[in-house]
Amino acid sequence: LGSADELSANNQVEELQRRRIKGEAHFLRALYYFTLVNLYGQPYCPKNVATPAVPLKLTEFVEDKDYVVNTVEEVYARVLADLEEADAYLKGNEVKNHPYRADITAVYLLKSRVYLYMQNWEEAAKHAQLCLDLQSELVDLNTFGNSETAFATASSPELIFSMGGNNIPRMLNDQFAGLSASADLIECYTQNDLRRQFFLTEVEYTEYYDCNKYVKQEATNNANVSDNFMFRTAEAWLNLAEAYACMGGENNEQEARTALDRLRQHRIETSHYEATALSGDALIEEIRAERRRELCFEGHRWFDLRRYTVSEKAPFTGSIRNTYSKYDYFWDDWEWKYYWDVSSSSTYELTAGDPAWTLQIPYEVLQFEELAPNPRHERAPISTEN
């Protein structure tokens, strides 16, 4: 940003390029700080926004000074300020058909996400609709093709913006992957939900499912979109649905159902599709479940669970459990392949209000800046099996 301010434009084209660079930079800084505040700060609660989050550093040069931790409110204010700057610089200043360059559509979608986290339902709905007014297409899985084609790619008509791809999706999509889809996630999909086919794949000779959303099983190529920083039209439809559902009232709930069903019509087998008839908290919960099914493996779930715990509408008061297992691997000369057995498993529980919903600031940062650590307590498993 500082360098862009020092550039002089010789003509209108160069000035538009300079403004575009500034707009993209403001968008990216907003996205980075939005990510940081949701990792290391408490979830945004309108009644309690003075809690510590992360330091704000807005200069590009090294400064010899001590930084202080800014509050959740201050970081969110900075995120929105950067998005307003991005809006001003990118509106009407487009680079068409470039998935790795943020434009005004991406700005609107990120704004809708930020306002959704802030529980500002009206602004969330407004900016989701602004995004959809520019790009609303959804892939119809009923006619998508065969199971050999990956769903999330740089050429998808749903893609609004993505950072570059990496090899993580490929590394987590073979029989030796260190992670797999949870049984709870798999059970979220009905047999008529086509996402089960295009988002997940069963690992041969096991009871596990891997993600095949970005690359197919045993693929040798890396994903060409990010598994954490990807913006799709599907999210805009879900943001719109959730915002209207949380506003409440007959008309708003009908808008929510319409937005939700627009997505579901493209995901459920046509012969088994039924329109949504829910209302009230049941509608909100169904939209949240749909969000989990649709946005799995895109970096949304942890942040969503955090914000549900402080939501004024249908707050999440339960707990989540995860089981971590250790495996013994062995080679079978006769079958010429590896097999494995679970040697031990430990189950941990995270309840609503637990400080572990906020990650600990890395040790190196705490030492360098002499910052106060986020509160934690020693955690023991609730059960262990050997």
Regions found by a protein language model. Give the residues of each.
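Conserved, well-structured interaction surfaces
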Residues: 1-40, 70, 87-92, 221-228, ...
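TPR-repeat structural position
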Residues: 76, 121, 250-253
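Aromatic- and glycine-enriched pocket-lining scaffold segments that form the walls
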Residues: 90-125, 129-131
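Hydrophobic-face positions in mid-chain alpha helices that act as interaction patches
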Residues: 101, 119, 123-234, 269-271, ...
